[in-house]
């Protein structure tokens, strides 16, 4: 029996590189956003708010990252399961209402393990997802 295990987590350096990539893409599509990164335990590692981004997007982006990390899937993937009558209806009311049920949060996976997650808020759901995917593309190139 092992009494401990090593846990990989995303680094601040990687989070900063992803933030740069997201900011560049957000400027390109003219959408000011808040970009958040959490570590493997869902704890805040980085939050970056672009000029003119909605203040409310700070909590939303962080909670998207938290959700993607803790549920080990994109936030857009749980939308159907939380609708009235579905198996996870009401899930968004748990965890001190930190669970976000629309797109913009994605887990960061390395060697089959979630090592953190990203969250983007400020644009449409489609724009937020695009920018979250931009972050993952950047991470895969590091």
From Swiss-Prot:
Disulfide feature: none
InterPro entries linked: GlcG_carb_metab_protein, PduO/GlcC-like, PduO/GlcC-like_sf
UniProt cross-references to PANTHER family, sorted A to Z: PROTEIN GLCG, SLR1406 PROTEIN
Family: Belongs to the GlcG family.
Protein name: Uncharacterized 15.0 kDa protein in dhaT-dhaS intergenic region
């Amino acid at each position: 029996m092992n009494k401990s295990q090593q846990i990989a987590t995303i680094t601040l350096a990687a989070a900063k590189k992803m933030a740069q990539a997201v900011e560049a893409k957000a400027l390109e599509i003219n959408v000011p956003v808040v970009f958040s990164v959490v570590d493997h335990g869902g704890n805040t590692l980085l939050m970056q708010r672009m000029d003119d981004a909605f203040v409310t997007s700070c909590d939303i982006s962080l909670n998207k990252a938290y959700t993607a990390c803790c549920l080990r899937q994109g936030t857009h993937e749980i939308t159907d399961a939380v609708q009235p009558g579905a198996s996870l209806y009401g899930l968004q009311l748990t965890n001190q209402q930190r669970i976000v049920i629309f797109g913009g949060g994605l887990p960061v996976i390395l060697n089959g393990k979630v090592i953190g997650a990203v969250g983007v808020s400020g644009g449409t759901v489609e724009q937020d997802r695009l920018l979250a995917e931009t972050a993952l593309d950047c991470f895969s190139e590091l």
